[in-house]
Amino acid sequence: MAYNAQFDLNFLFWFLRPFALVDVLKKPRFLDALTVYRDRRDYPHKLCNAIEAYGLTDAVNSHRAVDDARATVQLLEAMAAERDDLAQYIDLFGTHPKYGISGRKISSVTYHPQPYQRTVPLYELL
């Protein structure tokens, strides 16, 4: 799980590529908290906005890996308490409706344009 998982997976892809280990990215399951948050709240969609929107006063958004990981866990806990549908988002990444994804696609992930207007959850658009 990560906030904007596609961004992190791009780093992993390019790190693993010289060692011919890219296939390890096919095995795990992925949960992108950004995709879930986009379905729950209006723009802006930065992690700091999500922390504020859910009133996570203990969460720290310092752009440091450990702080951001802890904040993402707290955010996912809050979103799970709000609506019990996080399992529907596993291996589903919302993409920018105009620009698509950045970087390499992960073969085990379903990518789908995620509209700005929140009418139905992304998983219902598939």
PLM features: residue spans?
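DEDD superfamily 3′-5′ metal-dependent exonuclease/proofreading module
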Residues: 2-126
